[in-house]
Structures are given as structure tokens and as C-alpha cells.
Amino acid sequence: YGMSVDYGYRSGLFSFRGETATGSSHAWATINTMSYRLASNFTMRLVQRYYSYKYYSLFSQSYSDGGRVQNESGVYVGADWKPFGGLLLSYYADAAYFPWARYQASTASRSFDNLFSAVYTTGRLTLTGRYRLKKRQKDNADKTALIYKTDQRARLAALYDGGSWSIKAQIDGTTTVFKERSNGYMASLGGGTTAIRRFAIYATCGYFHTDDYYSSIYSYERGMLYDFSFPSYYGEGIRYALIVKYMPTKRLYVMAKAGTTDYFDRSQVGTALQQVDASSLTDIQLQLRWKF
């Protein structure tokens, strides 16, 4: 069995809400959020969470650093500030503690996450800058002690929305320190148009180069209707994809996607039963929707 209670309070510029749950595991999980608007252009948030290592619920979903509503407690602090016009500055810091062993950590461990972003919009142009620093304890090579894995990721992006068409340029960089230091970057360009009657076309292309798997680059990619993905890239290569939407009638919707990843540093992709004896991978998707 499982049961939970939701609660909340709001007064003026202050709001509080939360949820506490338990069940047949006889353990507790709770998350509580507070926000306060200090000024018309400045808001702060505080999130406290505690998920017992014994707690279990089949359909539980909540904010967490470890990806599960279990074996975690932590505090999140964030703020949004609009100093002027189209500029939005955001920052958050999150500290988490995992009292029991987890993947790649054979004893209690900790993690720290910080992110700063700036978004400036003027007319049809949007400029974005982001920096993230994350530290997480993991087992050393001999599994005799925990050491920190430190990830630093930065992004610069420019988006121009021309109404019936748009174009976006983006540069990602990463530095990872875990046993050794590794670096990586990716430069990508994407755009699309809806100017052609009944059609919508989107295309992306990106070049990536990383030292190894630890410095993998994650990049957003459009997918089918109601779908998207954040594939990871490591090594050296190019990723390009094309998406075409066709709406011949109000009831029929056709969408196709073709994408290819060409690697310059290997002659095989994947391992074991998923190994491909080639330096490239191609994925093709087709979706049809009919409204009754």
C-alpha cells in the first residue's frame, strides 16, 4: 500500500508547498518547497527533500540528484534575477547525501551541484550562457575509498527566430577530473522553416571532439511528436540529422527523421551484440498520426 498527503500555504509574496508519503515499506519520503519574491525582479527558492533508503513506491516521481525517490536527502537553493530589460540571471546550488551504497559508490557518499545561467533577449535574438560545476563521490580504482569526480560544463548559444524560420548556433565545452583529466567540446548549428505550405523542416549538424568517455558532450536533439533526446557524444566525429513534417490534411500527420553519426577515431561502434563494424551509425524514424 501507499499513501501521501499534499499541503501548501500562500501569503502575499511567500509560498510553501510539499508532499509526504509512506507505504508498506514503513519508511518515509518528503519534499518541501518554499519561494519568496523579495522584489518584482528577484525570487528565491528553497527545496528540502528526504527519501529514506527503505522507501519504495512503484510510480513515485520527485526531484532528486540520484534519479530515484530513495536513499537521498538534500537541500536546493536557487534564485532568479531580472536586473533590466530582457536579461535573466539564474543560479542554484544543491547538496545531496546518500546514506547507503549506490552505483559506483560502495558506501555513503555526497554530491554538490552548482549552475549559473544568463539569458538575454532582444527582439528576435536570444543569447544564452551557462556554466555548471558538479562534484560527486565515487569509488577509486581499488574500491578502497571514495574520490570526487568533478565535472565542469559551459555553453554559449545564439538563437534567431525569424517567424517562419529560425537558426541556432551553439558551443559546448567540458572538463572532467576523475582519476585523470579529460576535455571535450562540440560546435553545432541548427535551423528550420515552416515557410513551405504543409511542410516543416528542421536540420542540425555538429562536430564533437572529446578525450574520452568521461568528457562526453550531451546535446538536445528534436525527435518525433512529443519526443526528444539528449544523446551523448565522445571521441571525434560529426552528427547530422534531418526532420521533415508533412500535414496533407487536418487529420493526417506524417513525420520522418534520419540522423547519422560519423566517427573519425574508430572503425567499430558499440560492443558485444550491439557492435557495428563500421565508423558510422544511422537511425531512421517514421511516425503517422490520424485524427478521428
Where do the model's predicted regions map?
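Exposed, low-structure sequence patches enriched in small/polar residues
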Residues: Y1-F292
